[in-house]
Amino acid sequence: MAEGSGIDRKADERMEFSTSKEVTVHPTFESMSLKENLLRGIYAYGYESPSAVQSRAIVQVCKGRDTIAQAQSGTGKTATFSISMLQVIDTAVRETQALVLSPTRELATQIQSVVMALGDYMNVQCHACIGGTNVGEDIRKLDYGQHIVSGTPGRVADMIRRRHLRTRHIKMLVLDEADELLNKGFREQIYDVYRYLPPATQVVVVSATLPYDVLDMTTKFMTDPVRILVKRDELTLEGLKQYFIAVEKEDWKFDTLCDLYDTLTITQAVIFCNTRRKVDWLTDKMREANFTVSSMHGDMPQKERDSIMQDFRQGNSRVLISTDVWARGIDVQQVSLVINYDLPSNRENYIHRIGRSGRFGRKGVAINFVTTEDVRILRDIELYYSTQIDEMPMNVADLIA
């Protein structure tokens, strides 16, 4: 099912926006003056009308304005900047004109597939330039010429330094999941990429969460940006039920998980752990207990990660155990349950994790395992998102069915 066709319009209409004065709402894609072949691709992809974020952000980005767009997961953020990039590039010029940086390889690959689908009638070239893949293939594709490159900061910086990714025609830089990108791990690599870009490059920052320090940092490479910010109270996903299970000791979590599985019939579920070692340990324990599970984390070779994601997307595997590498923007429609085996160590990641369930307004349930030491973290998450996380009721099976 296409990304756009499942957006929860009621929740979308209720969103509160804090926007710059010049932002107007465009209720239809036709009113945005988009290219004919791009419109065809948008409708073929499953969109009928723009979501709240799309109706505000696309025209501003197409005008060339630096833009900060914040909206929760599942509101069509990826299509917002993909449509904008496709509108501003000139496909007659076989040079890179738009660059997207993402924090994970999976997200960069997903963005590439969205761009290719929306640009289906435009003869667009778009390449996923990511670590863990064959460098020779990157070089071949980039030397051939790509209109849009979607990549991870390390590999993109490397290709620019080697002069295979030519930057002189780049008009737009998109930072997707900017909160994660601008965290310490990627900050230097982004500056590395940014200094190779033409001085007039437009910058678009997109994320579900934008902490104040990130907004502060954007002043370094954005000029008078248009701001389209969802008010924080709206950021916990509507339609998602959130619960906790009090688990006295860490050692008891596994038995709690097994009990939970005995009572639930689940389409698909994701279980989050905070470390790669814990993912491997839990996967082994679940398999020993005769549960069919797959697992994924950043230490795995890219080919293996791709194959696990494909199996999960196609429904061949029903339970995926992962670290936060999976939590950023990966869209699997059937996910009905997210279990935080460990509460996220960074409260910003909470919304990214639970946003995997009930995408585009589909109902979903998030269950948090909370030890005595975790109570403070849970309260912090509740305060930060102005939400309430209740103890799990006995009839939770009815809520997920």
Swiss-Prot record:
InterPro entries in alphabetical order: DEAD/DEAH_box_helicase_dom (IPR011545), Helicase_ATP-bd (IPR014001), Helicase_C-like (IPR001650), P-loop_NTPase (IPR027417), RNA-helicase_DEAD-box_CS (IPR000629), RNA_helicase_DEAD_Q_motif (IPR014014)
The Helicase ATP-binding domain, residue ranges: 58-228
Localisation: Nucleus, Nucleolus
Gene Ontology MF term list: ATP binding; ATP hydrolysis activity; RNA binding; RNA helicase activity
Motif DEAD box, residue numbers: 176-179
Motif placement: Q motif: 27-55
Record-level GO BP terms: rRNA processing
Listed SMART domains: DEXDc, HELICc
Keyword RNA-binding: yes
Catalytic activity, as annotated: ATP + H2O = ADP + phosphate + H(+)
UniProt cross-references to Gene3D superfamilies, sorted A to Z: P-loop containing nucleotide triphosphate hydrolases
Keyword Nucleus annotated: yes
Annotated binding of ATP, by residue: 71-78
Entry keywords, A to Z: ATP-binding, Helicase, Hydrolase, Nucleotide-binding, Nucleus, Ribosome biogenesis, RNA-binding, rRNA processing
A GO CC annotation given for this chain: nucleolus
EC number(s) recorded for this UniProt protein: 3.6.4.13
One Pfam short name: Helicase_C
Annotated Helicase C-terminal domain residues: 239-400
Domain statement: The Q motif is unique to and characteristic of the DEAD box family of RNA helicases and controls ATP binding and hydrolysis.
Family stated for the protein in its record: Belongs to the DEAD box helicase family. DDX48/FAL1 subfamily.
Task performed by this protein: ATP-dependent RNA helicase involved in 40S ribosomal subunit biogenesis. Required for the processing and cleavage of 35S pre-rRNA at sites A0, A1, and A2, leading to mature 18S rRNA.
Entry protein name: ATP-dependent RNA helicase FAL1
Organism per entry: Gibberella zeae (strain ATCC MYA-4620 / CBS 123657 / FGSC 9075 / NRRL 31084 / PH-1) (Wheat head blight fungus)
